[in-house]
């Protein structure tokens, strides 16, 4: 259950529009793969979790979410294979329990028989066959959502997994009278790296396009300001315009805005000085970000 004190800003219309696009139900068809790029910490992953995934589920799809940043030290291909295995386990919970109870781990459908623990493993069942099995067994479309997909490029196995997803997409969606059985969504906080999945004839998703994820705007800050001010004394409240200006200066990053507002809210000043402090703190944090970015840039090798 959601804490009533927790601020949530739903973006259901955006979620519906993007799901329409990846389903092929929009004039802006992106059924070949939806690639969303946005700077880190701008609300992209939160949007996936609270808006886009529920939209897929409301339409009856099985959602497989893989966050390649959740464990940077693990092989990206294994994270993807593990998520697919988990989805199959959930759909086959009863059957697997019976099979393993009698010492078996193989099962199949549509002419495909495999060992669950070998999905995506060299010499084991391919991701294509595993996803095909999941669709045939459940009769439900599949939404495969890869968050921070650019990390797949860090290894050859990760790149191969991207090609496997593309092959699965082609196998499931061809000759289906426009029925999209496998919907693929890829997000990334590094647009240039994400583009390496779509630009060039040798890339896994050649021909797909990168879409800029719409950043939060004044509607978000106005709603958040109202939510925050309800919990503050009348003579110690934030000005909506000042909050948006700070938010914009911070690169439209919700968590950074909350940090700055928290510092200001606990200051001893009243509304006028508090809003001035808000601008000062946001500007200082922005300078700090730029300084860190400049230091990181100078530390890179020329090829990087």
Task: Label every PLM stretch briefly.
Residues 151-200, 213:
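Sensor-1/coupling segment of RecA-like P-loop NTPase cores
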Residues 1-39, 46-55:
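Walker A/P-loop-proximal flanking segment of P-loop NTPase domains
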Residues 46, 181-230:
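Alpha-helical sensor/transducer elements of the RecA-like P-loop NTPase core
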Residues 301-304:
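Regulatory alpha-helical "coupling" segment adjacent to P-loop NTPase cores
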Residues 31-143, 149-153, 158:
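P-loop NTPase nucleotide-binding core
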Residues 22, 156, 198, 225, ...:
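Short, flexible helix/strand-to-coil boundary loops that buttress conserved ligand/catalytic motifs
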Residues 26-28, 56-59, 134-138, 170-180, ...:
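Conserved catalytic network of the ASCE P-loop NTPase/AAA+ motor domain
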Residues 223-295:
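Amphipathic alpha-helical "lid/sensor" segments that cap RecA-like P-loop NTPase cores
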């Amino acid at each position: 259950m959601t804490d009533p004190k927790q601020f949530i800003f739903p973006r259901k219309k955006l979620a519906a529009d993007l799901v329409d696009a990846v389903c092929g139900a929009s004039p802006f068809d992106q059924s070949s793969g939806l690639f969303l790029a946005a700077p880190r910490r701008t609300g992209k992953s939160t949007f996936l979790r609270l808006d886009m995934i529920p939209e897929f589920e409301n339409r009856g799809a099985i959602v497989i979410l893989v966050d390649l940043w959740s464990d940077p030290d693990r092989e990206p291909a294994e994270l993807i294979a593990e998520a697919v295995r988990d989805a199959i386990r959930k759909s086959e919970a009863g059957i697997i329990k019976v099979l393993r109870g009698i010492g078996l781990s193989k099962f199949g459908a549509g002419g495909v028989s495999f060992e669950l623990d070998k999905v995506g493993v060299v010499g084991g069942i391919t991701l294509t066959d595993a996803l095909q099995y999941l669709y045939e067994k459940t009769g439900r479309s599949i939404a495969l959502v890869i968050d921070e997909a650019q990390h797949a490029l860090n290894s050859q196995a990760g790149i191969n997994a991207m090609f496997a997803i593309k092959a699965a997409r082609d196998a499931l969606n061809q000759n289906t009278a426009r029925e999209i059985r496998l919907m693929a969504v890829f997000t990334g906080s590094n647009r240039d790296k994400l583009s390496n999945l779509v630009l060039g004839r040798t890339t896994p998703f050649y021909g797909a396009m990168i879409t800029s994820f719409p950043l939060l705007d004044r509607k978000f800050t106005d709603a958040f300001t109202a939510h925050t001010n309800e919990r503050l004394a009348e003579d110690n409240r934030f000005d909506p315009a000042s909050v948006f200006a700070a938010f914009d200066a911070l690169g439209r990053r919700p968590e950074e805005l909350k940090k700055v507002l928290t510092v200001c809210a606990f200051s001893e000043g009243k509304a006028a000085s508090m809003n001035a402090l808000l601008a000062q703190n946001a500007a200082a944090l922005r300078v700090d970000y730029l300084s860190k970015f400049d230091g990181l840039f100078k530390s890179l090798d020329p090829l990087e």
